[in-house]
């Protein structure tokens, strides 16, 4: 818990922007502020000490424009920079704890230079053949941009795939460097579809 009278509490109150739009209690840390970054990294180190090996850096691209950044950055231009600052803050802690060769985060957003902090996944696709094709194009674009490792939500994230989409996406997804069955409203497990999927 956070001691409300501590210096860390003051950093939290001044440098974490909180909003309930996409999910309750979602907070964005101002990574342009070294104190806020250090506070956040200290929280990650506590989790690593408990055995956590990897962190998912989600929502790095949904940056509000009605905020004031500690370093004075233009809020309209933070869309790409924020994702780099966020992923870098997390990746640096993982490198410190696990070494450069074993540090892995699971990032949804990226910008130029992001390929140095693997792994990235394609975000929230829908459960359709068209979205699977979009995911493939996204992965090819990542590869052409120097990203050696990438992943995606097998079967799509939004909605529930039919058995055909799930099986085709599984075949495609298991050929990637990192595979993940994941969805927002239904389980993505083979036995939820049909015998052939198992």
List each language-model region with its residue ranges.
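Short acidic-aromatic active-site loops that bind/stabilize oxyanions
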Residues: 1, 29-37, 79-80, 198
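Active-site loop and adjoining helix of the penicillin-binding protein/serine DD-peptidase-beta-lactamase fold
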Residues: 17-38, 45-46
